[in-house]
Amino acid sequence: MKIQQQAFGGSEKMLKGGLHCHTTRSDGDGDPADVIRLHYQNGYDFLALTDHRYYNYTNFAPEVPMTIIPGMEFDNTFARNKGFRCFHTVCIGPAREDGNGYEQDERMDSGKAKDQEEYQSYLDAIHAKKNLTIYCHPQWSSTPASYFNKLQGNFAMELWNSGCAIEYEMDNNAAYWDELLGQGVKIYGVATDDGHGMHHHCKGWVRVRAENNIASILNALENGAFYASCGPEIYDFYVEDGKAVLECSPVAKVRLHSDMHPSHMRRDPEGNITHVEFNIGEGEKCGYAYVRMTVIDSEGRQAWTNPIWLD
């Protein structure tokens, strides 16, 4: 039996989109219109302007045919006395007429939760307004997985955050992802920019198999019909006859990740890998609960599939 990851095999175009960025509406350097134009010039089809606690539906560059995904970023800081930790959440939702509970320019106060059990009430309120949520930059937030592994309702978490990687060399969020996946938490992974400076933008994105409208994009995201990338393209990912198979643009490394050994890795110093097959066993001979792949091109840029669950 062939199990194909949801991003592949459909007839829709693979749209390029940004899910986390900031403008002068909060603490970003770029005017909203300039940020939208920059993304359009870099081949983006859709973009969420997720300024801190300040909801947005508006395309501030109306001459640009960019689908604007409604959204904002919600934040919560705790343990302030001797340093602090954070919960940050990107919220993205439908058009106002499709039931989104937020108003244009609606402002929110920062959260005051002291732990994930208290923070859940904020997520519940966001979900009640028909918004999807992404757990942001756990490494930068100094939140080990045990601080957020019980949060309910996040459809995704950030694997890559360009601002954190550029400014702090913090790009190891995928390790947290595998910890959650290994615990049975079914959550997808996204690459974002969290762009504050203009030089942060257009470095991490998602490729979503959807029609180019808000409802279709959100449905595809919620159902895992996408992959995350900083450059490489992924064309197919599936499991069949005891093998995990991936097709991609030319890369130098491909790694299979799961909750168990053995791990699998293929390398080509020339950077010409476009097809890999890893034997993972079939039926009772397969000990993995899930498999996912990371590809790395000759410039060090990564892309990540979402998991295929096998249990």
Language-model features and meaning:
Residues 158-164, 181-184, 225:
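Short, well-ordered alpha-helical segments in soluble proteins
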Residues 2-132, 136, 143-145, 150-153, ...:
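A metal-dependent hydrolase metal-coordination microenvironment
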